[in-house]
């Protein structure tokens, strides 16, 4: 496993379905998210957008940056013909959940994970 961030980024974008979107302020990266377009065998939502790793620098939270990023993600998802946008959020992040609900998202599923490598 390669823990070099540059190699991780290159692997992430290699298939062309995932983008890393970075928000900049005064020449400094202050926010980011990953957007992956998923093509599924699902009659109701054959193309979905998966958002992951939404981050805003702590001292800049509450200034609308996160909301602007999520609007950007929606615009990109629609441009890719996605009919649904989804993401996961740690169950302990109540403030983040309320933020997403204010943006119109609904909690619809329970998430499950399984480590495939020993840690």
What are these regions (language model features)?
Residues 1-20:
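Active-site rim helix/loop that mediates acceptor-substrate recognition in acyltransferases
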Residues 22, 28-37, 55:
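Conserved beta-strand in the GNAT
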Residues 38-40, 56-59, 92-94, 117:
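Short coil/turn motifs at secondary-structure junctions
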Residues 40-51, 61, 108:
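A conserved beta-turn-beta hairpin within the catalytic core of GNAT-like acetyltransferases
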Residues 53-56, 62-75, 98, 102:
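Conserved acetyl-CoA-binding loop-helix of GNAT-fold acetyltransferases
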Residues 70, 77-89:
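Conserved GNAT acetyl-CoA-binding A-motif
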Residues 86-96, 113-118:
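Conserved beta-strand-loop-alpha-helix junction that forms the acyl-donor binding cleft
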Residues 100-110:
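Conserved acetyl-CoA-binding loop of GNAT-fold acetyltransferases
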């Amino acid at each position: 496993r390669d823990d070099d961030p540059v190699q991780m980024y290159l692997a992430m974008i290699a298939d062309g379905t995932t983008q890393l979107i970075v928000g900049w302020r005064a020449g400094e990266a202050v926010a980011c998210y990953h957007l992956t377009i998923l093509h599924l065998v699902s009659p109701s939502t054959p193309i979905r957008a998966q958002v992951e790793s939404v981050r805003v620098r702590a001292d800049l939270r509450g200034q609308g940056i996160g909301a602007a990023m999520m609007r950007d993600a929606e615009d990109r998802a629609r441009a890719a013909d996605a009919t649904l946008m989804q993401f996961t959020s740690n169950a302990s992040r109540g403030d983040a959940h309320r933020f997403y609900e204010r943006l119109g998202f609904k909690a619809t599923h329970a998430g499950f994970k399984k480590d495939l490598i020993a840690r």
